[in-house]
């Protein structure tokens, strides 16, 4: 389900790249998140996109998020955020599931999954509970701590791209929680 939603959001982003490649032959009225949403609606129809994402959220919640991989959870909320859609119930359910996984040390998250999760919440102004940010910051600290504090090697093995760290910091700033 996460990959299906991801593909719809990615398609909208790629459509914008095509429009940008056409240069002066095309005039965009909007840019950024709104343009991605509009492109998606033009390609698939607004009712279809909204309907698909609402039904996907319902299915995810009824199926149970414990069955989803970390990447599925990350991809699902990323797709919603990329299109500028907020489904409060799904975001809250994902928040609770991720928090449970992080605090109970049930699974290892990759840096991209963590940063995309927080980026998604910040992008749609979902305002997660402070305990969600606390769980993320504790997990990152635990994964990166050495005997003498933070080891750069561990930090770079968790967050392989600078953009992931930037998204993490930006997400914390937007939701107003500073670990």
Task: Describe the role of every protein-language-model region.
Residues 1-179:
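Eukaryotic RNA-binding helical-repeat scaffolds
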């Amino acid at each position: 389900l996460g990959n299906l939603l991801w593909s719809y959001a990615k398609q909208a982003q790629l459509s914008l790249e095509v429009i940008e490649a056409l240069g002066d032959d095309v005039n965009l009225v909007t840019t950024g998140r709104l343009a991605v949403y509009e492109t998606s609606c033009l390609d698939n129809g607004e009712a279809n996109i909204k309907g698909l994402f609402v039904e996907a959220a319902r299915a995810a919640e009824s199926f149970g998020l414990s069955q989803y991989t970390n990447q599925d959870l990350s991809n699902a909320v990323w797709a919603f955020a990329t299109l500028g859609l907020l489904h409060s119930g799904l975001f809250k359910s994902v928040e609770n599931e991720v928090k449970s996984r992080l605090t109970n040390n049930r699974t290892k998250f990759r840096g991209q999954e963590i940063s995309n999760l927080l980026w998604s919440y910040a992008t749609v102004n979902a305002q997660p509970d402070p305990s969600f940010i606390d769980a993320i910051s504790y997990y990152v600290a635990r994964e990166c701590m050495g005997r003498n504090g933070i080891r750069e090697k561990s930090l770079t093995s968790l967050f392989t791209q600078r953009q992931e760290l930037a998204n993490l910091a930006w997400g914390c700033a937007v939701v107003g929680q500073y670990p």
